[in-house]
Structure formats: structure tokens, C-alpha cells
Amino acid sequence: MTEANKTTINDAQKIAGSDPREAGTQLRPGLWPTINERYPGSMITKETSVPLAPLTKPLNQARLVMISSCGVHRKIDRPLDVCHPFGDFGFRRVPSNAKPAELTIHQLKYPHDDADIDINVAFPIERLQELAAEGTLGGLTPNFFSFIGYNMDPERFERTVAHDIAEAVVVEEKADVALLVPA
């Protein structure tokens, strides 16, 4: 970024004559203080909290599923759509016994250079396999789940992707506990 392109909140405030954090105020063309100001309604805010489900058995007897927003998938699977302006409303199943060399991250919304070297940085599949093998975990579900966290219609995401993953985790995978891994 060149010196001429750097704009601070204070600089923008001096130029605009108002607080640039006010809704609808751009710092400069294409730069908004928050994503919700650029795309109103893009953030889910809830008045109620979701109660945690108590663990009903010891972890060394529990079957774990991993759910990640990093966009990982097997190289042989169709990648998630990273070009659609509203995001992808799908997800990928990743076999829990997959090898890192079989996996890739197809994602443009965050840097994943380190995860390209070691997938466990964003999707700790080998660490979970090790914990299951040593008996710290009772086991792993046959599949883990991954989706793209970038999504501009969170209510649709909640109704579709989140609902479909939750149903698969409970009905098909029969998970006792879920590890949520944000990217």
C-alpha cells in the first residue's frame, strides 16, 4: 500500500467533517469502517443465546465431529464457489480418515499460505486422528464438515447450510460432541 493510499479514521474524519464510523460513511471509495455498514443486515444479531448441550459421556467415550469455516475439501471434490458475491451456501464432507495430502483450501477471503503448508493450521485433522488413536477421544465421526465462512446472507446460511450440517451431524454422523473451528 502506498503512502498516498493510506487513510486513517482521523484523516477521513477531517476530510468528511464527521465520524466515518457513522452508518453509511465511506472512508474512501470501496473502504467502509465495518462490513455491516457496507452490507446492512449482513451480520446476525440475536437477543437470545443458544444453550450449550451438556456432554453426556466422558470425552474418551465420545464421538467427535469437526465443523470448520475454512473451506477445506478433498482435491477430488468440486471446490466451493469463492467468486459468488454472496458466498457459497453449500458445504463439503471431509472423511475423518483423510490424509492432509488429499485436502486443499479453495478460499479467496483470507490468507491461507500457512495452511497450504500444513492443513492442520486451519483444519486440525491429524491432531484429532492422533487424539482418537491414543484414546483421548472415543472416536471420530466418519465425516467432518467444511464450508466457506464468508457469506453475505447469514439468515439464509442459518436456514440452509447450518441446518443441513446440524441434521447430518446428529442423524447421519451420530456425533456426541462437535469441535467448531473458525477460519
PLM ranges: what are they?
Residues 2-183:
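Metallocofactor- and cofactor-centric catalytic cores in central/energy metabolism, strongly enriched
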